[in-house]
Amino acid sequence: MKYKNVYFINGTAYAGKSTMVKMLSEKYHGIACEENYHDVLISNLDSNQYPGLTYTRDLKDWADFVRRTPDEYEAWIEETTKECAVLELQILDKLSKQGKMIFVDTNIPTDVLSEISDKDHVLIMLADPEISVNRFFERPD
């Protein structure tokens, strides 16, 4: 199934994705699915079904988070990315039935986006890597 009324904005930190989603949803009286909009579902997730997304929720000792090997961390990021996409698509299935334009700040992988959306409904925004790295922790979020 391809979404006809959903527009995806993907990319790096500081590229302007959140700003673009807000502005487009205001201009077109649409729905803004802002960064991490799927977080509203996390508190009710089963840790067996969503081990990546519930890892930090259920973490007893943050030292365990920091002590992971680079390979373990990478595997967690990859798992969490897949799980986020599942939740986002569940939310978008419901929202898309409202008939409004939906603008999504997302990290859904591009191979998934190519299956669920037309090319002209996907925008990839990239910030200068130096800005993304040097200013990342200046963000309020």
Residue ranges and their predicted role:
Residues 1-4:
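Phosphate-binding P-loop
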Residues 9:
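Hydrophobic anchor at the beta1->P-loop junction of P-loop NTPases
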Residues 12-15:
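ATP-binding Walker
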Residues 18:
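Walker A/P-loop
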Residues 28-46:
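Short beta-strand-centered segment that lines the nucleotide-binding/catalytic pocket of NTP-utilizing
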Residues 38-39, 108-110, 126-133:
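Conserved nucleotide-binding/hydrolysis micro-motifs of P-loop NTPases
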Residues 41-101, 108:
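ATP-dependent small-molecule kinase phosphotransfer cores
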Residues 116-141:
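Conserved phosphate-donor/acceptor-positioning beta-strand/loop module used by diverse small-molecule
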